[in-house]
């Protein structure tokens, strides 16, 4: 049996409303992930305890995760790609299997042309081929289509500044 994904799987749903304080905390941490709660509190004019409590709630609600983001190319991973997977039957077992692999950094079940979409980060093209062959060998996989990344043009992690207006609370 494969290990379960690090975070729980679930449908894409609308989480609780975020207010201006939540948004300010998210934006501060996106700018400087190591910013202290005291400094954030001073910037936005609230108590440090409030920042600490709001941060804990944002993390518990899986809205916020502060982590070090690396550049795979800088770490020696020279082959990245997206793999579209079609399955016979339920896509969940296939997605769960792949989500347990270290090469898979993003796995989603989708509606549309593919049942599962997987982003892979591999050492080189030979390794990417080995991993795509492992995907093809999973029970229930009918077909795959691999999209090899040629050049990274944009990768951002600043969604906090883009909270949809209808999601904001007063």
Predicted feature residues:
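A compositional/biophysical signature of low hydrophobicity enriched in polar/charged and small residues
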Residues: 1-170
């Amino acid at each position: 049996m494969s290990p379960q994904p690090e975070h729980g799987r679930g449908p894409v749903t609308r989480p609780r409303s975020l207010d201006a304080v939540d948004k300010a905390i998210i934006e501060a941490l996106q700018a400087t992930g190591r910013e202290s709660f005291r400094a954030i509190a001073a910037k936005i004019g609230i108590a440090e305890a409030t920042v600490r409590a709001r941060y804990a709630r944002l993390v518990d609600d899986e809205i916020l995760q502060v982590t070090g983001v690396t550049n795979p190319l800088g770490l020696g991973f020279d082959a990245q790609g997206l793999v579209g997977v079609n399955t016979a039957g339920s896509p969940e077992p296939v997605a769960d299997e792949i989500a347990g692999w270290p090469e898979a950094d993003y796995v989603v079940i989708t509606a549309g042309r593919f049942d599962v979409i997987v982003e892979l980060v591999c050492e080189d093209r030979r390794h990417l081929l080995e991993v795509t062959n492992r995907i093809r060998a999973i029970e229930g996989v009918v077909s795959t289509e691999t999209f090899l990344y040629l050049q990274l043009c944009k990768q951002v992690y600043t969604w906090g500044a883009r909270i949809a207006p209808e999601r904001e609370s007063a």
